[in-house]
Amino acid sequence: MSFPCKFVASFLLIFNVSSKGAVSKEIRNALETWGALGQDIDLDIPSFQMSDDIDDIRWEKTSDKKKIAQFRKEKETFEEKDAYKLFKNGTLKIKHLKIHDQDSYKVSIYDTKGKNVLEKTFDLKIQERVSEPKISWTCINTTLTCEVMNGTDPELNLYQDGKHVKLSQRVITHKWTTSLSAKFKCTAGNKVSKESRMETVSCPEKGLDIYLIIGICGGGSLLMVFVALLVFYITKRKKQRSRRNDEELEIRAHRVATEERGRKPHQIPASTPQNPAASQHPPPPPGHRSQAPSHRPLPPGHRVQHQPQKRPPAPSGTQVHQQKGPPLPRPRVQPKPPQGAAENSLSPSSN
C-alpha cells in the first residue's frame, strides 16, 4: 500500500474513534430520567436560571437530531405537534408518554452574543406503573402467596411482622412455621411507581379449613336439591300414572256401557213372549166377525170346525230362554172370538 493511502486510512480511523468517544462521553454524562407510561414528565435543566442575557433555548432528540422545541427572545416559541410544551425557564414537558418517546433529549442554551453557555442531555426511560399486589394464603399448609399483575420490571418484597423474608419479581410463595398468626406486608415497585398491601393472617390451631367447610356446605346443599328434585319427580310420575289409570277405567266403563246399550233392542222381543196374554190383540167388540188374513169368510159350520186348528201353540218360557242369537220371526196369532159370537154362530146348526 502506498504512503498516501496509508495516511488517509489512518486519518479516517482516528476520526472514527474520536467521534465514537464523543458520543459515548455524551451518553455517559446524560442525566437518567424515568417516566411513567401514559403520564406527563418535565425535563428540568439543573443548575440553570433564566436571565435577560439568554437569547436561545433549543431542545432536540439525539437519535435523529430533530428540533422539537425552541425559545427565542422576541419571537414566537416553537413546539412540535402539541406533544411538547416549553416553559420560559427552559423546562420541557412531554405529554402523555408513549413507548416511542423513550429516547435521549439534548438542550442547548445560547446568550445574546451567540455563545453556547450550557448543554445538557437527558436519557429518558419509560416504564409501566405497577399494580397493587394481591395476597392469598391457606391454613392447611400455612402457605402465603403474593403476586403483582401489571408493571414493567416489578420488584416484590415480602415482610413478616416487619422483617424482610423474601424478594422476587412477579410472584412470592412463602411458608411460615413460627406461628399460626402473623402480619404480612407485600410491596411492589419499579422506577416510576410503588404499591403495597398488608394482611393479618390468623389460622385456628385445630379445625377445618374455610375452603373445606365451604365445600362440605356446598356438597350438602347440592345433595338436598337433588333429593328434593327426585321426590318431586317420583310424586309427579305417580300422579300421572294415577290419572292415566283413571282415564283408562273411565274409557273402559264408557265402552261397556255403549256395548250394553247396543244389545238392549235385540233382547226386548225375546223377553215379551213370557207373557202371551199381553202380546195378544185386544178382543173385538161383540157382533164383530173376525177374519183370518188373506182368507174369505167361511160358512158358519165350517168356521167352527177349522177354527181350533189355526191357533198355533203358545211358546213356553223355557224355549224362549234357550233361544240364542237374534229373535226369529213369530207367526201372527189369530184373535179368539168372543164367547157370545161363538154361541150365535152355533145356534143355527143346533136348530
Swiss-Prot record:
Feature: compositional bias, Polar residues: 342-351
Gene Ontology molecular function terms on file: signaling receptor binding
Glycosylated residues (UniProt): 89, 141, 150
Membrane spanning residue stretches: 210-235
Entry keyword set: Cell adhesion, Cell membrane, Disulfide bond, Glycoprotein, Immunoglobulin domain, Membrane, Repeat, Signal, Transmembrane, Transmembrane helix
Major location (coarse): membrane
Residue ranges with Pro residues bias: 326-338
Domain Ig-like V-type: from-to ranges: 25-128
Disulfide bonds: 139-203, 146-186
Residue ranges of the region described as CD58 binding region 2: 106-120
Region (Disordered): 241-351
Region (CD58 binding region 1), start-end ranges: 61-75
Segments on the Extracellular face: 25-209
GO biological process: cell-cell adhesion; natural killer cell activation; natural killer cell mediated cytotoxicity; positive regulation of type II interferon production
Signal peptide: 1-24
Domain of life, per lineage: Eukaryota
Subcellular location(s) per record: Cell membrane
Pfam families, A to Z: C2-set, V-set
Function, as annotated: CD2 interacts with lymphocyte function-associated antigen CD58 (LFA-3) and CD48/BCM1 to mediate adhesion between T-cells and other cell types. CD2 is implicated in the triggering of T-cells, the cytoplasmic domain is implicated in the signaling function.
Subunit structure: Interacts with CD48. Interacts with CD58 (LFA-3). Interacts with CD2AP. Interacts with PSTPIP1. Interacts with FCGR3A; this interaction modulates NK cell activation and cytotoxicity.
Identification of the protein by name: T-cell surface antigen CD2
UniProt source species: Macaca fascicularis
Gene: CD2
